[in-house]
């Protein structure tokens, strides 16, 4: 059975425990605050375009030139829906890795680096092929070094699926999954209720803008036209018309059920830390796995507060991005022990 950890605001503070910023424990404030405190990328990224076997590409944002850092431990970040290096959690963690002497990299999903991808496909919560190919390319190109993968939200569900599918064959030493929607169908309904509809509208606008850019650059590469795209009102409708159809699923519900990581979690073989907040406004209790469903190598941490990929502690004058210490601290055992 997995190790289950809960944190409470009254407990003694350490990097393993999350205490929300005083007066700002509200889930929506926690979700939104990172964009206030982590507005700009504070390092100069080294960009690289990786051509894929099918003629498409993904863009990589490194903390430094990887050819000059082959010996360093590696931390790979998989972002969330319409995320990128500019997402506060992504560049914040890469910067934290850089400060520890590690090589950090964000693998942008297809079409998420600012330039539309070429092929008749996009990315989704269960699309593990690109991540798998990248991790193996990383090892082939730069040799063996301790490697960890971190997935946030959609990228977390994808990473969980990848870990489950490939088991010990996946070339990573450990993984961390944050705020992942392990039950996609339930989360899609939750996003249509109450204040969560604000997040749905925001994300849907990003999805539609990205799809419109793709249609303009590569006409005919999506199964709908611009007029149909403009009429989409819900993420589930977007997934029905585009995500499911372009990737061979019957509809959005079929896609959600086939790509939800929850039924696969018991197959994870690599050491993995999963972090959820009870008050995550993007999802409900159905994403919380049962302890008996998790293998011993999975540690599950459920916090009372934190919102969705928030977890802001400290004070307004001195905010603390808890994930930027919690994740590297947990991974140190796997990355630095083998790099000596």
UniProtKB/Swiss-Prot annotation:
The active site is at 153 (charge relay system), 280 (charge relay system), 308 (charge relay system). It is an enzyme of class 3 (hydrolase). InterPro entries: AB_hydrolase_1 (IPR000073), AB_hydrolase_4_CS (IPR000952), AB_hydrolase_4_sf (IPR050960), AB_hydrolase_fold (IPR029058), ABHD4 (IPR012020). SUPFAM superfamilies: alpha/beta-Hydrolases. Residues 73-312 form the AB hydrolase-1 domain. Pfam families: Abhydrolase_1. It comes from the Bacteria. GO terms for cellular component: plasma membrane. Its EC number is 3.1.1.-. GO terms for molecular function: monoacylglycerol lipase activity; poly(3-hydroxybutyrate) depolymerase activity; short-chain carboxylesterase activity. Transmembrane segments: none annotated. GO terms for biological process: lipid metabolic process. Keywords: Hydrolase, Serine esterase. PANTHER family: ABHYDROLASE DOMAIN-CONTAINING PROTEIN, ESTERASE YHET-RELATED. Belongs to the AB hydrolase superfamily. AB hydrolase 4 family. This is Putative esterase YheT. It comes from Escherichia coli (strain K12). The gene is yheT.
């Amino acid at each position: 059975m997995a190790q289950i950890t809960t944190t409470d605001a009254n407990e003694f503070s350490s990097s393993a425990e999350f205490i929300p910023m005083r007066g700002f424990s509200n889930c929506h404030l926690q979700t939104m605050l990172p964009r206030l405190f982590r507005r700009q990328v504070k390092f100069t990224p080294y960009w690289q375009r990786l051509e894929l076997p099918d003629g498409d590409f993904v863009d990589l944002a490194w903390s430094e030139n990887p050819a000059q850092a082959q010996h360093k431990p590696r931390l790979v970040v998989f972002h969330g829906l319409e995320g990128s290096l500019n997402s506060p959690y992504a560049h914040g963690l890469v910067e934290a890795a850089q400060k520890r002497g590690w090589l950090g990299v964000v693998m942008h999903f297809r079409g998420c680096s600012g330039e539309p991808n070429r092929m008749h496909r996009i990315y989704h919560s269960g699309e593990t092929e690109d991540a798998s190919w990248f991790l193996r390319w990383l090892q082939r190109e730069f040799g063996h070094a301790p490697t960890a993968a971190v997935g946030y939200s959609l990228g977390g569900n994808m990473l969980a699926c990848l870990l489950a599918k490939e088991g010990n064959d996946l070339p990573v030493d450990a993984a961390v999954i944050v705020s992942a929607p392990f039950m996609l169908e339930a989360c899609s309904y939750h996003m249509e209720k109450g204040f969560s509809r604000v997040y749905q509208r925001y994300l849907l606008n990003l999805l539609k803008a990205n799809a419109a850019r793709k249609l303009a650059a590569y006409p005919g590469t999506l199964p709908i036209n611009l007029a149909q795209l403009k009429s989409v009102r819900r993420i589930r409708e977007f997934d029905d018309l585009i995500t499911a159809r372009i990737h061979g699923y019957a509809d959005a519900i079929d896609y959600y059920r086939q790509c939800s990581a929850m039924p696969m979690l018991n197959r994870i073989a690599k050491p993995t830390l999963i972090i959820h907040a009870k008050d995550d406004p993007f999802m409900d209790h159905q994403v919380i796995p049962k302890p008996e469903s998790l293998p011993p190598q999975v540690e599950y941490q459920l916090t009372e507060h934190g919102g969705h990929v928030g977890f802001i502690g400290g004070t307004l004058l001195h905010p603390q991005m808890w994930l930027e210490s919690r994740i590297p601290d947990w991974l140190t055992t796997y990355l630095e022990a083998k790099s000596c």
